[in-house]
């Protein structure tokens, strides 16, 4: 698995330390192990997880601006855990409303000694503790849903980062909240079939 991760990182032009690579592989092993009982992801094969979960998250890293981020509807920690491993200088809050997912994330943080992540069990509409430089999500079906639930979470200069598949601009036209498109970035995820986009929005 280490060799495959090394190849994927080279293809994506991402540089990580050996320690960071070990943490990413450790995360995949834990996700695979816990998935059998907790049903955390539909992806069953660990090597497939490297592409569909790890690389799909890591390619966002270069586009993040700021120091504080919240991953809304993080599920088993995606994209938050890979991004936190790749960016130990940034702080991440991982928010989910399902207890089993937060329990899993807490175990990951303990076993892999990740210190820049705060897991929070909450529904997004009930979380008002603070604001962030960036609001991350790959969980929402539509940009309109994301903005309806998360509109108060970015600070004055903060941005929304939505991970999407195919993007043609029509989804943005359905958004009710006042918002501006900062960028629509086509992502290169090595060995992933299908399009991926990062939609960056600001109030």
UniProtKB/Swiss-Prot annotation:
EC number: 2.1.1.170
UniProt keyword terms in alphabetical order: Cytoplasm, Methyltransferase, rRNA processing, S-adenosyl-L-methionine, Transferase
Catalytic activity: guanosine(527) in 16S rRNA + S-adenosyl-L-methionine = N(7)-methylguanosine(527) in 16S rRNA + S-adenosyl-L-homocysteine
GO molecular function, one term: rRNA (guanine-N7-)-methyltransferase activity
Binding site for S-adenosyl-L-methionine: 73, 78, 124-125, 138
Superkingdom per UniProt: Bacteria
A Pfam family assignment: GidB
Coiled coil: none
Protein name: Ribosomal RNA small subunit methyltransferase G
